[in-house]
């Protein structure tokens, strides 16, 4: 049996176990968190060459698997993003179990990770977005949840992969017909343009990724944060493979030029709407969009030289996201999902740690000092100032608008108590947020703590 098949079967089994334990969501979340953590630990320790032993079975690592004319292989290059996905899944499952979030999240996390692993390990490369559409369908179920709510987020999550896939399909057809394309240079040029358009769609021009903002208003806090994070890891990996496989893309449109502008437009869009937000969920959605753009801005400005920093970012971001989502989830339990600002009276008095978690997590995501992401955000802005002055100025404006948006929400959360029957935050929520705050503080004081892990992931990732 190949290691890839074992990994997929283990994820499916975890999903089934979580489904059977749906009446005990805390136990289902704990099982998923431990299972994903065990898989991540086993994959981290596994050597690159030769067979490995897991659960008494001999697993072949680089053995390709065939399905529907696709080839799937767990190469060293995709080991790094798979480890990141497993880490994100384990952390979010554990935090969501402690905070009593929606039950559908726990069986859906392993299935979504399995679909994303198929997407990352599939060949031919230009057909891989077909599996991304499958992952998007699963993401839609997670976004909708098991409560009656608007279907905006669930429907919008399907938009980008469905629109991007035909462009990759056209490019794949032209590249497979090289003899025909050689006689028609326009066809060849159109194929490269189609490939670039597909990349543009997946790197999220704002109108096509309204699902990110809709997640804040129409999904649970943990579901929104998890979906945005794992999507970005998968897209980053796919686009990097594209650039290595088809380096001629840079002759038509250099990503080092257009990617930073797309990212800063997202940040500006998000910052402006964060400043004008009237609901807590709305602020959360635009905060996720700002974070998404900031990660691609870091990659676009630094290119391959910043790959280690990008991996460090993907290691630290889930800690800050779970902190913010935990605070928001606890507040939503008392004030309802996506509460309006005018209803948040007394939140800081009755739920001090939940309020602190949301406010601190929000400004830490923006890169505020004392936060775990401060070193990365500072480095990104310094590179922008050195390499692209215009982008730096727009990024500073986006940052200022985002900070003002969080401050507006903080003023509402700290308003005087009006309803004396408002319950206090659960002790488990307070302890969870406290631990996450402490973990973020440790990383902020010692940013190099995770550097060895990021370096090892980069070594594997460079084995393309």
Task: Annotate the PLM regions.
Residues 1-10, 72-85, 124-135, 186-201, ...:
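Structural signature of hydrophobic alpha-helical transmembrane segments
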Residues 20-26, 107-194, 200-205, 274-340:
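Alpha-helical multi-pass transmembrane bundles of energy-transducing inner-membrane proteins
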Residues 32-44, 109-120, 138-139, 157-173, ...:
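Small-residue-rich segments of transmembrane alpha-helices in multi-pass membrane proteins
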Residues 1-6, 12-98, 106-107, 453-463:
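Transmembrane helix-loop-helix hairpins at membrane boundaries of multipass inner-membrane proteins
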Residues 315-338, 353, 390-425:
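Predominantly late transmembrane helices and immediately cytosolic-facing juxtamembrane segments
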Residues 63, 195-261, 285, 362:
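Short helix-boundary/re-entrant hairpin motifs in multi-pass inner-membrane proteins
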Residues 142, 295-302, 376-392:
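Interfacial segments of multi-pass membrane proteins
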């Amino acid at each position: 049996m190949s290691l890839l098949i074992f990994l997929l079967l283990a994820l499916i089994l975890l999903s089934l176990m979580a489904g059977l334990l749906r009446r005990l969501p805390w136990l289902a979340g704990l099982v998923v968190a431990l299972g994903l953590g065990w898989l991540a630990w086993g994959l981290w320790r596994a050597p690159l060459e030769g067979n490995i032993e897991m659960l008494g079975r001999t697993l072949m690592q680089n053995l390709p698997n065939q399905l529907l004319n696709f080839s799937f292989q767990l190469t060293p290059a995709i080991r790094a993003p798979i480890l990141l996905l497993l880490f994100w899944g384990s952390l979010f499952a554990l935090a969501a179990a402690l905070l009593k979030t929606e039950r559908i999240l726990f069986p859906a996390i392993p299935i979504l990770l399995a679909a994303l692993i198929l997407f990352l390990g599939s060949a031919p490369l230009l057909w891989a977005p077909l599996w991304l559409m499958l992952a998007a369908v699963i993401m839609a179920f997670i976004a909708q949840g098991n409560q009656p709510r608007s279907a905006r987020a669930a429907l919008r999550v399907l938009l980008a992969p469905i629109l991007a896939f035909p462009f990759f399909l056209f490019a794949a057809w032209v590249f497979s017909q090289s003899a025909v394309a050689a006689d028609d240079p326009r066809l060849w040029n159109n194929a490269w343009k189609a490939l670039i358009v597909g990349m543009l769609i997946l790197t999220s021009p704002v109108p096509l990724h309204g699902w990110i903002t809709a997640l804040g208003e129409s999904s649970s806090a943990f579901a929104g944060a998890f979906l945005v994070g794992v999507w970005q890891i998968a897209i980053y990996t796919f686009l990097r493979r594209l650039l290595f496989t088809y380096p001629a893309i840079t002759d038509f449109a250099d990503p080092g030029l257009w990617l930073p502008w797309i990212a800063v437009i997202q940040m500006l869009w998000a910052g402006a709407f964060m400043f004008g937000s009237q609901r807590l969920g709305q602020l959360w959605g635009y905060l996720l969009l700002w974070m998404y753009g900031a990660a691609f801005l870091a990659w676009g400005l630094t290119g391959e030289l910043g790959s280690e920093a990008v991996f460090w970012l993907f290691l630290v971001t889930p800690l800050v996201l779970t902190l913010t989502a935990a605070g928001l989830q606890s507040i939503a339990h008392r004030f309802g999902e996506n509460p309006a600002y005018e209803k948040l009276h007394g939140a800081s008095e009755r739920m001090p740690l939940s309020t602190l978690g949301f406010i601190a997590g929000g400004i830490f995501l923006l890169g505020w000092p004392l936060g775990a992401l401060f070193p990365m955000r500072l480095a990104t802005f310094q590179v922008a100032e050195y390499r692209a002055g215009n982008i730096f100025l727009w990024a500073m404006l986006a940052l200022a608008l985002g900070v003002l948006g969080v401050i507006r929400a903080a003023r509402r959360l700290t308003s005087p108590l009006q309803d004396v029957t408002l319950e206090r935050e659960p002790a488990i929520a307070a302890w969870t947020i406290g631990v996450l705050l402490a973990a973020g503080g440790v990383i902020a004081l010692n940013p190099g703590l995770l550097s060895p892990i990021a370096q090892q992931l980069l070594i594997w990732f460079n084995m393309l």
